[in-house]
């Protein structure tokens, strides 16, 4: 028994090729503009308690650049997800 292949190009729509994302290298990235370093904040700082968060907010506000912002009170519930 033999195989017989027949192509119907008129019935098959060509699938568009997915667009390839342009690869970015370091030479394409410029220096930051209007960058002001105000504080270092790590995950440990946020989990050490609300007093620490308030302290960080006060430190950042003392550096300036927050004059146009509206302040608000935020309440968060921390949930410990450590595996037991």
Swiss-Prot record:
Domain CRIB as annotated: residue spans: 29-42
Q: Which Gene3D superfamilies match?
A: CRIB domain
Pfam families according to UniProt: PBD
Lipid addition (S-palmitoyl cysteine) is recorded at 10-11
Query: What keyword terms does UniProt attach to this protein?
Result: Cell membrane, Cell shape, Cytoplasm, Cytoskeleton, Lipoprotein, Membrane, Palmitate
Principal place where this protein is found?
A: cytoplasm
Instruction: Determine if Acetylation is one of this entry's keywords.
Output: no
BP GO annotations: regulation of cell shape; regulation of Rho protein signal transduction; regulation of signal transduction
**What does the entry list under GO cellular component?**
cytoplasm; cytoskeleton; plasma membrane
Q: Where in the cell is it found?
A: Cytoplasm, Cytoskeleton; Cell membrane
A GO molecular-function annotation: small GTPase binding
| Membrane topology annotation | Lipid-anchor
Q: Superkingdom of the source?
A: Eukaryota
Q: Which family, according to UniProt? A: Belongs to the CDC42SE/SPEC family.
Q: What function is annotated for this protein?
A: Probably involved in the organization of the actin cytoskeleton by acting downstream of CDC42, inducing actin filament assembly.
Q: What is this protein called?
A: CDC42 small effector protein 2-A
